[in-house]
Amino acid sequence: MGKLLYHKIYDSHVIHEDTNDDPILYIDRHLLHEVTSPQAFESIRFKNRKIRRPNKTFATMDHNVPTIMQNIHSIEGMSKIQLNQLTKNCKDFNITLFDLSHPHQGIIHVLAPEQGIILPGMTVVCGDSHTSTHGAFGALSFGIGTSEIEHVLVTQTLRQPKYKSMGINLFGTIPPYITAKDLILFIIGKIGHGGASGYIVEFYGDVINTLSMEERMTICNMSIEMGAASALIAPDVTTYNYLKNKKFSPNKTHWNQALLFWNTLHSDHDTNFDKIFNFDISNIKPQITWGTNPSQVISIDQPIPKLEIFTDPIERKSVIQALNYMKLTPNTYLTNISIDKVFIGSCTNSRIEDLRSAANIIKDHKISNNVHAIVVPGSKPVKKQAEKEGLDSIFIKAGFEWRLPGCSMCLGMNEDRLNAGERCASTSNRNFEGRQGRGGLTHLVSPAMAAAAAIAGHFVDIRTYF
């Protein structure tokens, strides 16, 4: 009997099993940022402990950093304290830090893949929910809490349960204007906000095979929004081509040896998932969320659902609460809804392909007078490449603000946020109440849809608007 990809990686990293507790896994990569790591380091100092493998630990500054000007001396309050503390912690414990002055600084889930830090078959952890992004490389990746961060820093291990397995097969032909963001929003809408709870999801099929690494990262990034513990995509030639010649990828001497191992990282034919979903994506339309979780999503040409279709009283109550918060009513078309802000960025959609997609829509247009729009590249290399291609000029000429790398408006933790009542077309991954700022109203869309909304001043169907 063969094994699933998930089981191959999991089993190969078990270093201790206990009948009364979850197995202990060895961790290959530990990613840090300024928000969830300070308490862990404080505890380590208090207990006079050492970092087990600083060479397998990588840190960046992303959540709290301003995106207008990135001078640490100009930052104030808790943000400055956390950034300074991260600098000290990394220096004291000899951890690689991509700080604000580093040419590779950026969002941790953008930076790590583009530097080749994440490789197929690895176990990866980070104190961030969207660590599942790295499953796009066939790496088993988990978001962890502060106490677990401390444990991994000190032991390079972590207890992890063995989750159930879910296979999601995508087949068909991707329609024009449809992006990876549309695919994953569609899937979340079908499976539900908690439909994958307790599962590791593997995405596979002909459609997955055609996607770029950046598109695969978008899909794995948002798998957490349907409750999955993490997500995986088996590595293939697309993966290998992406990783070749990256800073931390295997060098020429070790490349062929790495390929031999990576080529074993797939789910064997004679094994089964605990649950399987099959989706024909041939007729998917541009997706947009209307509520306060990513599963409350519709096609752009559909009205907001009527309350009658929600027969479960708990779900119905949740829908009513979401509609009240979002200031929307059932049976309304979102193409009739005006917006105030547009945010193109986040660890979901801030890579070069995302910016190209948005710029392709924006080119030779101006944004609406009533819209404030910003573009935030996911890393300095992304920003540099975009400027080399002239994308920054396209955005600036259209009326967008061209910002510096960071998490930015994805979460209301820095200077970029929504004011109460402001409605935003956002390429981020979460639309919970207050996620982008207290009282802010978030609609999740693809970069192309966000760009089109910026031009029109309201949501539009990009298939027919231009």
UniProtKB/Swiss-Prot annotation:
Keywords, ordered alphabetically: 4Fe-4S, Amino-acid biosynthesis, Branched-chain amino acid biosynthesis, Iron, Iron-sulfur, Leucine biosynthesis, Lyase, Metal-binding
Pathway: Amino-acid biosynthesis; L-leucine biosynthesis; L-leucine from 3-methyl-2-oxobutanoate: step 2/4
Keyword Transmembrane helix attributed: no
Cofactor(s) for this UniProt protein: [4Fe-4S] cluster
Binding residues annotated for [4Fe-4S] cluster, in chain numbering: C347, C407, C410
UniProt record similarity statement: Belongs to the aconitase/IPM isomerase family. LeuC type 1 subfamily.
Listed HAMAP family: LeuC_type1
EC number: 4.2.1.33
InterPro entries in UniProt: 3-IsopropMal_deHydase_lsu, Acnase/IPM_dHydase_lsu_aba_1/3, Acoase/IPM_deHydtase_lsu_aba, Aconitase_4Fe-4S_BS, Aconitase_4Fe-4S_dom, IPM_dehydratase_rel_enz, IPMI_cat
Pfam name, any one: Aconitase
Gene3D superfamilies tied to this protein: Aconitase, domain 3 (3.30.499.10)
Subunit structure: Heterodimer of LeuC and LeuD.
Name the UniProt record assigns to this protein: 3-isopropylmalate dehydratase large subunit
Keyword Transferase part of the UniProt annotation: no
GO molecular function, one term: metal ion binding
Co-factor: note: Binds 1 [4Fe-4S] cluster per subunit.
Cross-referenced CDD domains: IPMI (cd01583)
Disulphide bond pairs: none
Reactions accelerated catalytically: (2R,3S)-3-isopropylmalate = (2S)-2-isopropylmalate
